[in-house]
Amino acid sequence: MVAATEFPVSPMLTDAARRNRLWVRIWLYCVIVTLFAIVLVGGATRLTDSGLSITEWKPIHGVIPPLGEAEWAEEFARYQQIPEYEQINKGMSLEEFKGIFWWEWAHRLLARGVGFVFALPLLFFWVTGRLERHLKPKLLGILALGGLQGAVGWWMVASGLSERVDVSQYRLATHLTIACLIFNATMAVARGLAPHSGKPALDSTRRFAFWLVVAVLVQIYLGGLVAGLDAGMAYNTWPLMDGALVPQGLFEHRPAWVNLFENPKTVQFVHRLGAYVVLLLALWHAIATLRAEPDSTHARRAVLLFLLVCVQAAIGIATLLMVVPMDVALAHQAMALIVLGFATAHWRATRGAYPFMQAAA
């Protein structure tokens, strides 16, 4: 049997330290909820083809939407200059434009908002000495990822403003994955500050839980490629694709590797395979943990994680069979975040709470 990893031994938490951890944890959970909302609104923006409706990046002035008919006409005129309007939405009315504008505007507003939700409390906790030393580099790293995400978001939008009629699937998948990394990192820190009970997890359990998180992240990246290519429309049957387990034409482009990123049929096929892999890994993890650590909190979490993956798989199948309706597709995206968040919390819990380190004077 593999030896258990001992939870870090730390000095007894004082009442003040316990309160500080509680407030920092509450703040981070608020950040997580905001991130969840951003990703869902981003998904709706993609599903409604709204992502290119705002053709400029104005970090400050962009908070204020058009306020009068003249400003709306000016905003619409800018949109009419890009290929998406010329080739896809020619003849769109101003009212129809407003419909797609508000999705993109809401997504950008939430993205700006989460910066304040994260940065201002971080500054407060820092200057008041409520942050333990080991938390500071972790939180600064998350803040840096947030700044990078803003730049990647505009880089993604810019890909659809000159020649394409949509954004690059490479950039969209990157944008989604970075958002999930921020979500993942925030969840890990929050869970590390929570009290832990029970015996430490075995090394094998902890390692498997980590790689399961990685597998979920990879699957989300593949889902980003599916969204970017509208690959969910390629085959709307299950379990077969075009009447076969392995459909024809998966590698019709040259070089062959390009199909993994640019052929909608191949991208959907790989995403399906990824789903089966995650499902099998979650099942294996649940069975192995139940055998190695019966009646432990780790085993119960592993079983619950497997059940969440099953629900996500069912929603994914429904999304295909129903030809990607917006509500079901958004439920699929939301469930992906729930699976990722729970998998991350589960992995972090196998390592125990952070050791207590007093904030530097």
From Swiss-Prot:
Q: Which EC class is this protein assigned?
A: oxidoreductase
Q: Name one GO molecular function term.
A: oxidoreductase activity, acting on NAD(P)H, heme protein as acceptor
Question: What Pfam families does the entry give?
Answer: COX15-CtaA
Q: Which residues constitute the signal peptide according to the record?
A: none
Q: How does it assemble?
A: Interacts with CtaB.
| Coarse class of the protein's main subcellular location | membrane
Which amino acids does the record list as binding heme? H271, H332
Catalysis: reaction(s): Fe(II)-heme o + 2 A + H2O = Fe(II)-heme a + 2 AH2
Recorded GO CC terms = plasma membrane
Keyword Chaperone (UniProt): no
Residue spans crossing the bilayer: 22-42, 109-129, 139-159, 175-195, 208-228, 269-289, 303-323, 324-344
Q: Which cofactor does it need?
A: heme b
Q: What is its EC number?
A: 1.17.99.9
Q: Which gene encodes it?
A: ctaA
Species: Chelativorans sp. (strain BNC1)
**Localization:** Cell membrane
GO annotation (BP), single? heme A biosynthetic process
Q: Which family does it belong to?
A: Belongs to the COX15/CtaA family. Type 2 subfamily.
Keywords attached to this entry? Cell membrane, Heme biosynthesis, Iron, Membrane, Metal-binding, Oxidoreductase, Transmembrane, Transmembrane helix
Pathway linked to the protein: Porphyrin-containing compound metabolism; heme A biosynthesis; heme A from heme O: step 1/1
Q: How does it sit in the membrane?
A: Multi-pass membrane protein
Q: What does this protein do?
A: Catalyzes the conversion of heme O to heme A by two successive hydroxylations of the methyl group at C8. The first hydroxylation forms heme I, the second hydroxylation results in an unstable dihydroxymethyl group, which spontaneously dehydrates, resulting in the formyl group of heme A.
Q: Give the protein name, as stated in the record.
A: Heme A synthase
